[in-house]
């Protein structure tokens, strides 16, 4: 959050000599700052006195995180040091519901020897969005701009959700990276009429782009709203085309896409390991978001390897993290492959103001 009586302005726009791509977009806020230097001879960005005035012009802001309040959905969960110390946090958890059909792990051909999974530690995540940028660069995601994002046509596979907990002056900001959960009981797979999205033997919710006919049923049935539809054939004008990842299939108009757990990296590592006559070892495969995270909040690996770091953090018998483990929207029984670890606070945040429904969504997710 922003301190009361303080103004925060993003920088980096309003370029005049950046070519066809970035020239003329936005406003250069540097022109608003006085020409003051600190003791080191650098421009002073903080501590500048400013005044806000109403003008007869309108503008709008765009974000991709939706509602700023959780409304009791426990998406960005938190606990306290006291609860963890006394073991109170674990008392409120429940066992998974019993299943009528056998789990895929009991089916021949599934999850042997790999089942890919991820853990995200919300106590480490500071919302810097480096993971989002890394995903764009790794997977050739197009930047659609402000206008298309405003109508729900953003193409980011990973978004940083921000939630405000508390009321009055007693509040905190929580960040939750949200991406495809690679569900073991995914709602998207059952509604695709052409089998373009399916559950592969390694636990990935895979995509076959050539099969997709763009019904968008999968997006409608995704509770996490992480699927993206190509409304256009997005172009990368020169020289931006030279920065594209050649190991990634280029998607065309009318095709749905989403996070793949960087399957291209998995396949490359498996190929190298196969040449050496062995299975992959823990840590050999890193997703782009994991590799870029400066706080190491993301852990990725093979859940079938009990000695892997991700398995130790995600398994229910993990003594260190079991009181912090949870799955987003677990009540839907989608069996996501991503386990979140609760943020740890030093005190309880009072958030029982049920009458406050938060901000309305500034945009609709496509």
Language-model-detected regions and their locations in the chain:
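Long, compositionally biased charged/polar accessory segments in the mid-to-C-terminal portions
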Residues: 257-366
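Ferredoxin-like iron-sulfur electron-transfer modules
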Residues: 100-127, 159-187, 193-217, 228-288
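Iron-sulfur (Fe-S) cluster-binding segments and ferredoxin-like electron-carrier domains
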Residues: 134-145, 231, 297-309
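C-terminal, active-site-flanking charged/polar segments
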Residues: 1-38, 44, 214-225, 289-299, ...
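Carboxylate/His-rich catalytic cores and anion/metal-binding grooves
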Residues: 128-167, 213-227
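Long, contiguous, secondary-structure-rich segments that constitute the structural scaffold
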Residues: 1-117, 123, 134-137, 141, ...
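Short, well-ordered loop/turn and helix-capping segments at boundaries between secondary-structure elements
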Residues: 2, 13-16, 137, 141, ...
């Amino acid at each position: 959050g922003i301190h009361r009586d303080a103004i925060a302005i993003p920088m980096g726009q309003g370029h005049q000599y950046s070519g066809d791509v970035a020239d003329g977009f936005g406003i250069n806020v540097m022109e608003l700052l006085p020409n003051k230097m600190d003791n080191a001879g650098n421009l002073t960005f903080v501590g500048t006195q400013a005044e806000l005035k109403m003008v007869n012009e309108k503008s709008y802001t765009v974000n991709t995180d939706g509602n700023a309040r959780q409304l009791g959905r426990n998406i960005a969960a938190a606990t306290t040091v006291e609860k963890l110390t006394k073991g109170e946090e674990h008392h409120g958890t429940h066992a998974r519901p019993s299943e009528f059909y056998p789990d895929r792990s009991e089916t021949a051909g599934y999850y042997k020897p790999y089942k890919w999974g991820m853990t995200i530690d919300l106590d480490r995540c500071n919302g810097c969005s480096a993971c989002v940028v890394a995903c764009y660069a790794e997977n050739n995601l197009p930047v659609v701009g402000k206008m298309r994002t405003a109508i729900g046509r953003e193409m980011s596979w990973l978004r940083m959700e921000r939630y405000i907990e508390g009321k009055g002056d007693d509040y905190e900001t929580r960040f939750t990276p949200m991406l495809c959960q690679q569900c073991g009981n995914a709602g998207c797979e059952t509604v695709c009429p052409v089998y373009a999205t399916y559950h592969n033997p390694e636990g990935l919710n895979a995509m076959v782009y050539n099969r997709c006919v763009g019904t968008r049923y999968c997006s409608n049935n995704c509770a996490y709203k992480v699927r993206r539809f190509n409304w256009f054939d997005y172009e990368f004008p020169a020289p931006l085309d030279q920065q594209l990842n050649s190991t990634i299939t280029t998607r065309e108009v009318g095709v749905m896409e989403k996070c793949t757990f960087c399957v291209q990296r998995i396949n490359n590592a498996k190929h190298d390991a196969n040449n050496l006559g062995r299975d992959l070892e823990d840590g050999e495969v890193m997703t782009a978001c994991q590799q870029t995270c400066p706080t190491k909040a993301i852990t990725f690996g093979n859940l079938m390897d009990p000695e892997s770091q991700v398995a130790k953090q995600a398994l229910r018998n993990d003594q260190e993290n079991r009181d912090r483990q949870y799955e987003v929207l677990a009540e839907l029984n989608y069996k996501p492959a991503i386990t979140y670890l609760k943020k740890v606070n030093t005190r309880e945040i009072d958030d029982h103001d049920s009458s406050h429904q938060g901000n309305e969504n500034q945009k609709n997710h496509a």
